[in-house]
Amino acid sequence: MTIVEELLFTERFLWEGKSYVVHIYRHAAKKERCLHMAETVLGPGDTIISDGHSAEEALHKQQTILPLAILSRALL
């Protein structure tokens, strides 16, 4: 099975004065449906990933979960 990954676009997510980069990818596997993925690297070995049926859905999920992810790291 061949998996193809394509960067569609990059967005900035602003939270409490900081900017976080969100990359939106499309993954397509032969003979399977397409999946979209949003990825944000918060630090070394710390990556947040959300998926969706569309790029917009993946981005919306990522924007919803990022504040919680960022705040949870501040507690550590």
Give short role names for the model-derived ranges.
Residues 43-76:
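Mixed-charge, Lys/Arg-enriched low-complexity segments
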Residues 13, 25, 38, 55, ...:
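Compositionally biased, intrinsically disordered low-complexity segments enriched
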Residues 1-19:
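Negatively charged, low-complexity tracts enriched in Asp/Glu with abundant Ser/Thr
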Residues 26-47:
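Short aromatic-glycine-(Arg/Gly/Cys) micro-motifs in beta-strand/loop hairpins
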Residues 6-7, 25-27, 44, 73:
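Compositionally biased, intrinsically disordered low-complexity segments
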Residues 17, 29-30, 56, 60:
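Generic cytosolic/nucleocytoplasmic N-terminal low-complexity/intrinsically disordered segments
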Residues 21-23:
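Short linear proline/tyrosine/threonine-rich motifs used for host-factor recruitment
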